[in-house]
Regions:
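Acyl-donor (CoA/ACP) binding surface of acyl/acetyltransferases
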Residues: 18-129
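Active-site rim helix/loop that mediates acceptor-substrate recognition in acyltransferases
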Residues: 1-13
Length: 129
């Protein structure tokens, strides 16, 4: 996983960043950008994503970290659009997308998840700068 992150920074100039709590520098998870490479009509777009350990959910850390990543992208890169997606069942992540100002585009079946799996159906959001 670490090597994939390093490779993406080297090839794309962006990747995932560690998220830590300010008070004690506890590692909480990550946020950042990722090149979308699986077979969908928005492939070759850039995804903004986040993943935090369960004990940090619901405390505002994900929107805070994602907002910082959005601001960096807007002010320090030439990237003009970001996507984000999650399973329809992951309402917490979808709320983060809404809180950071992303617009819902549509639903889609994730091509890497079997069609009968409950996590197959996803929701897609984007934001343009």
């Amino acid at each position: 996983f670490y090597q994939r992150i390093q490779n993406e920074f080297q090839t794309c100039g962006f990747g995932l960043y560690a998220v830590e709590r300010k008070e004690d520098h506890a590692f909480m998870g990550y946020t950042g950008l990722h090149q979308i490479t699986f077979d969908v009509d928005f492939a070759l777009g850039i995804e903004i994503g986040w993943r935090l350990a369960h004990e940090y959910w619901g405390q505002g850390y994900a929107p805070e970290a994602a907002t910082a990543c959005l601001e960096y992208t807007r002010n320090k890169t030439d990237i003009k659009e970001l996507f984000s997606f999650t399973s329809l069942l992951n309402q917490r992540s979808e709320r983060v997308m809404q809180k950071i100002g992303m617009e819902r585009i549509r639903e889609f079946d994730h091509p890497l998840v079997p069609g009968e799996h409950p996590l197959c159906r996803h929701v897609l959001y984007h934001i343009k700068f």
